[in-house]
């Protein structure tokens, strides 16, 4: 797991995409490549608030490997790392 010095808010999740290795030696331009849909959770927010003001804990935790929607979230760069900030609801599954 990475040691990133970022905090995300509410029900947001910070993901480091995992790029799958390409087989066969075919090089595609970046515009033709499929966006990754698998990543590692780096950080999570404290959760959104319910109508009583209490925090609703997130299901995922830092270190989880997950599948997420292909066009989910906002891509950011922090140092040399490309990361994605998304809502927990954009995560489809936790890989066990």
From Swiss-Prot:
Function: Together with the chaperonin GroEL, plays an essential role in assisting protein folding. The GroEL-GroES system forms a nano-cage that allows encapsulation of the non-native substrate proteins and provides a physical environment optimized to promote and accelerate protein folding. GroES binds to the apical surface of the GroEL ring, thereby capping the opening of the GroEL channel.
GO molecular function: ATP binding; metal ion binding; protein folding chaperone; protein-folding chaperone binding; unfolded protein binding
Name of the gene this protein is made from: groES
Cysteines joined through disulfide linkages: none
Keywords assigned by UniProt, alphabetized: Chaperone, Cytoplasm
Subcellular location per the Swiss-Prot or TrEMBL entry: Cytoplasm
Alphabetical list of SMART domains matching this protein: Cpn10 (SM00883)
Cellular component annotations (GO), alphabetically ordered: cytoplasm
CDD domains: cpn10
Subunit structure: Heptamer of 7 subunits arranged in a ring. Interacts with the chaperonin GroEL.
Pfam families per UniProt: Cpn10
A biological process term (GO) from this entry: chaperone cofactor-dependent protein refolding
Organism: Wolbachia sp. subsp. Brugia malayi (strain TRS)
Protein name in the entry: Co-chaperonin GroES
Family: Belongs to the GroES chaperonin family.
């Amino acid at each position: 797991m990475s040691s990133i010095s970022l905090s995300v808010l509410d029900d947001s999740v910070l993901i480091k995409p995992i790029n799958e290795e390409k087989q066969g030696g075919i090089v595609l331009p970046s515009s033709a490549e499929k966006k990754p849909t698998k990543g590692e959770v780096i950080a999570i927010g404290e959760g959104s608030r319910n109508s009583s003001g209490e925090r609703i804990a997130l299901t995922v935790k830092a270190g989880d490997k997950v599948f997420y929607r292909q066009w989910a979230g906002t891509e950011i760069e922090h140092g040399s790392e490309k990361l994605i900030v998304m809502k927990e609801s954009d995560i489809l599954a936790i890989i066990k």
